[in-house]
Curated annotation (Swiss-Prot):
Function: The RecF protein is involved in DNA metabolism; it is required for DNA replication and normal SOS inducibility. RecF binds preferentially to single-stranded, linear DNA. It also seems to bind ATP.
Family: Belongs to the RecF family.
Binding site for ATP: G30, P31, N32, G33, Y34, G35, K36, T37
Principal location listed in the UniProt entry: cytoplasm
Protein name per Swiss-Prot or TrEMBL: DNA replication and repair protein RecF
InterPro entries referenced in this protein's UniProt entry, alphabetically: DNA-binding_RecF (IPR001238), DNA-binding_RecF_CS (IPR018078), P-loop_NTPase (IPR027417), RecF/RecN/SMC_N (IPR003395), RecF_2 (IPR042174)
Length: 385
């Protein structure tokens, strides 16, 4: 798989650009702040319908405009597929597949399969559980696009149920007991959709675990062994069983946990149980990586998580596109060499670098130089001829 064409209109710093890309390695070169990462971000958005840098879509739209468009042509096994994504302010985003409108933007998920390496990856080890949940969900969606709808529906249920929990004090004051019947309905919906999401995550962690261990050993052979596990908020006594992916059983456990935490939820007005409260546990030896890993170990583990994702996508069928955003500048010589070796088999590698010296020696790559120019509308990124 490779991206043959990338077109942007009013996306971040790019007013208008059309890039013809090729299999093999391409390096986008330019000083920091010139818009290199925005190209990678656009491709990642086409992969997951989300940015790796921000949680909302508004910052993706160029200042002074009301919409951004990302257009890609992806070649997979000799077949071309065109995707256009329109990100708009104040209205629902739209998508087209091979020039035809689709009902939902989720319908284009899976056309482009990519793995992203970025400086933000350090947050997978040292950041909040939300960073690790997003890593799992993004990978699950790339592998099984239907998970995007599962997550979207679960998030809708959590929003509705949270609003209901916040309304309980007023309902009690009015003597309205019907709110508790409604809450039971939303409990069932949370358990149903939450169980499906948890099952997908646990199944994914089971497959990732041996790949993470192998990749970490390659990156840090002198370090302790790496392991991962899934911790569910419904398991008040400890981590969930890693083989437990039965949806009915998971739903029953979620309902039981909701009942057990009902008083606390009513007091605080928030949902305390569900996959939005879960975490991916990372360990080095018998210690949690967060708080105990050195800077080098943390980077090795972060890269190992991405390499493991890359390997799973390869096993699924077809080489995913590798997106490397300034990651070589963050790694020492040994880890840089290990990542470069892993990338050698990829059909397409798209890399950003502030200076060419950040690219591994001996890499044969096309170079695209990025600059910034200004006009009456402000500064914008451009590709130098």
């Amino acid at each position: 798989m490779y991206v043959r064409h990338l077109g942007l209109r009013d996306f971040r710093s790019w007013a208008c650009v059309d890039l013809e890309l090729h299999p093999g390695r391409t390096v986008f070169v330019g000083p920091n702040g010139y818009g290199k990462t925005n190209l990678i971000e656009a491709l990642w958005y086409s992969t997951t319908l989300g940015s790796h840098r921000v949680s909302a879509d508004l910052p993706l739209i160029r200042v002074g405009t009301d919409r951004a468009v990302i257009s890609t042509i992806v070649v997979n096994d000799g077949r071309e597929c065109a995707v256009d994504l329109e990100i708009a302010t104040g209205r629902v985003n739209k998508a087209r597949l091979n020039r035809s409108s689709v009902r939902s933007t989720r319908d284009v998920v899976g056309v482009l399969r990519a793995v992203l390496f970025a400086p933000e990856d350090l947050g997978l080890v040292r950041g909040d559980p939300a960073d690790r949940r997003r890593y799992l969900d993004d990978l699950a969606i790339v592998r099984r696009p239907a998970i995007a709808a599962v997550r979207a529906e679960y998030e809708r249920v959590v929003r509705q149920r949270t609003a209901l929990l916040k309304s309980v004090p007023g309902a009690r004051y009015r003597g309205d007991r019907g709110v508790f019947d409604t809450l039971e309905v939303w409990d069932s919906r949370l358990a149903e959709h939450g169980a499906e999401l948890v099952a997908a995550r646990i199944d994914l962690v089971n497959q990732l675990a041996p790949e993470v261990k192998k990749a970490y050993q390659l990156l840090a052979p002198e370090s302790r062994s790496a392991s991962i596990g899934y911790r569910a908020s419904m398991d008040v006594t400890g981590p969930s069983e890693q083989s437990d992916t039965d949806r009915q059983l998971l739903a029953a456990r979620l309902l039981a946990a909701l009942a057990a935490r009902r008083d606390a939820e009513l007091e605080r007005g928030v949902c305390l149980v569900g996959p939005h409260r879960d975490d991916l546990i990372l360990r080095l030896g018998d210690q949690p990586a967060k708080g105990f890993a050195s800077h080098g170990e943390a980077w090795s583990l972060a890269v190992a998580l991405r390499l493991a994702a890359y390997q799973l996508l390869r096993v699924d069928g077809g080489e995913p596109v590798l997106l490397l955003d300034d990651v070589f500048a963050e790694l020492d010589v040994m880890r840089r060499r290990a990542l470069a070796t892993a990338a050698e088999s990829a059909e397409q590698v798209l890399v950003t670098a502030a200076v060419l010296e950040d690219i591994p020696a001996g890499w044969d790559a096309r170079r695209v130089h990025i600059d910034v120019r200004a006009d009456d509308t402000g500064s914008m990124s451009v590709v130098l001829p």
